[in-house]
Amino acid sequence: HSGDPSIYGAIGEQMRRLDRFEIPYEVVPGVPAFAAAAAALKTELTIPDVSQSVILTRTAMKSSAMPAGEELENLSKTGATLAIHLSIRNIKAVVADLTPAYGEDCPVAVVYRVTWPDERVLRSTLLEIAGEVRAAKLTRTALILVGRALDPLTGSESRLYSAEHVHLFRHQKSG
């Protein structure tokens, strides 16, 4: 569900058991769902002057509780792009927790079964997304991305490519 064994998997406990019995194993990295979703959306998750951070998180449902301070309400105060795993059935609570900080017009993308042949993408706003998820009957295997960086018209150009930006391959013009 996350694309990589190190994110929201049980790999830690599995490796501890294998280690205890001295069973050799290899950890093979995967493509994280948030990165695959960004590719499917053809978008950047970090944009200068908009968001320079991506937070990977989830909501507490039937699984373990969230550690103190890691609730969506707290994370939303950062303004970072959020990649919310394992929470599509909790979409109404996600919207309620994020709307005060991000606003009803904040872009949201829900990517169902990213990289699979039946992949589906919903692009919307915090105001509309819960209804669209319900109408699409998405109940599992969907990643929720939230943040101003998801708006393709938002943000400024990277200073890296500015003619005024001096770096190793672009020296300061004399005179």
Each language-model region and where it sits:
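A contiguous loop/helix-start segment that scaffolds small-molecule binding in enzyme catalytic cores
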Residues: P5, A10, M15-R16, S51-S53, ...
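Short glycine-cluster motifs
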Residues: H1-M61
